[in-house]
């Protein structure tokens, strides 16, 4: 069970990083 929770946390953190990088690159292109 704890492994499943850790996997979900990893996915959320990974997608959060990917989204942050994508938005950052988009903002740089707009500027």
Swiss-Prot record:
Lipid bilayer topology: Single-pass membrane protein
Pfam families named in the record: PetL (PF05115)
InterPro entries the UniProt entry points to: Cyt_b6/f_cplx_su6
Entry keyword Ion transport: no
Chief location of this protein within or outside the cell: plastid
GO cellular component, one term: chloroplast thylakoid membrane
UniProt keyword annotation of Transmembrane present: yes
Alphabetical GO biological process terms: photosynthesis
GO MF terms held by the record: electron transporter, transferring electrons within cytochrome b6/f complex of photosystem II activity
Keywords of the record: Chloroplast, Electron transport, Membrane, Photosynthesis, Plastid, Thylakoid, Transmembrane, Transmembrane helix, Transport
Subcellular location: Plastid, Chloroplast thylakoid membrane
Family to which the UniProt record says this protein belongs: Belongs to the PetL family.
Description of how the protein assembles with itself and partners: The 4 large subunits of the cytochrome b6-f complex are cytochrome b6, subunit IV (17 kDa polypeptide, PetD), cytochrome f and the Rieske protein, while the 4 small subunits are PetG, PetL, PetM and PetN. The complex functions as a dimer.
Protein role: Component of the cytochrome b6-f complex, which mediates electron transfer between photosystem II (PSII) and photosystem I (PSI), cyclic electron flow around PSI, and state transitions. PetL is important for photoautotrophic growth as well as for electron transfer efficiency and stability of the cytochrome b6-f complex.
Protein's UniProt name: Cytochrome b6-f complex subunit 6
Species the sequence originates in: Porphyra purpurea
